[in-house]
Amino acid sequence: MAEIITDGSQKELKKHGSDEFPLLVSYEKLSGYKSGSFLWHWHPEIEITLVLDGQILYKVNQCTYHMTAGDILLGNANVLHAGFMEDMKDGKYVSITFLPKIIYGSYGSILRRKYVEPFLHNFSLPAVYIDHSQPWHEIFSEYVREIITLYEEKKEFYELDITGTLQKLWRCMLQNLPENLPYTEHSKLERNRMREIMDYLEHNYMNKIQMK
């Protein structure tokens, strides 16, 4: 049975991809975890989750998403997230986990400053939910599936092809975010407070929480 190993701050210790190409595509199912769920954790990578079958009760920070087959969720870097069965039904999914630098390249790049960092640091954007309710969701979904296929086939130049498709996916998302979206920067205090709350909830998951 699978289990997510974390450190004291709930940071996942698993390496996603390699130093040369920090991207990993993996197939999972909730029933494959010891508790029938993947519990609260975070990592510096962005994670895209595509539900293949069943359903997942997906939580990101304070947000809850009721995901079904075909739904996609892009979780921001460094956000706390967890996934649970809903109505005791299993959920099968594929995850694309990658470091943001695949999109922007060098640290001093204008791509990082202009198109990536503002998203990563926006506390009001813990995740973007793709439920096919808008026309651009179909385009986004096609990019996700293309990345999965490229990774699985690993043909010549696949790293370049994945990087290019990932950049197109990122552009598709950015240009369709609401124009009036509030911008709230992350702070260490906010992140630590959130992790303390989630840590308490996780350790008391099987117990009745006393309200005082």
Give the ranges of each region predicted by the language model.
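Detector for the N-terminal beta1/A-loop initiation region of ABC nucleotide-binding domains
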Residues: L57, A82, N204
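Aromatic/histidine-rich interaction motifs
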Residues: R113-S141
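Generic protein-terminus/edge-of-domain signal
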Residues: M1-I72, N78-V79, D87, L111-K114, ...
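Ligand-binding loop in jelly-roll beta-barrel domains
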Residues: N78-I103, G108-L111
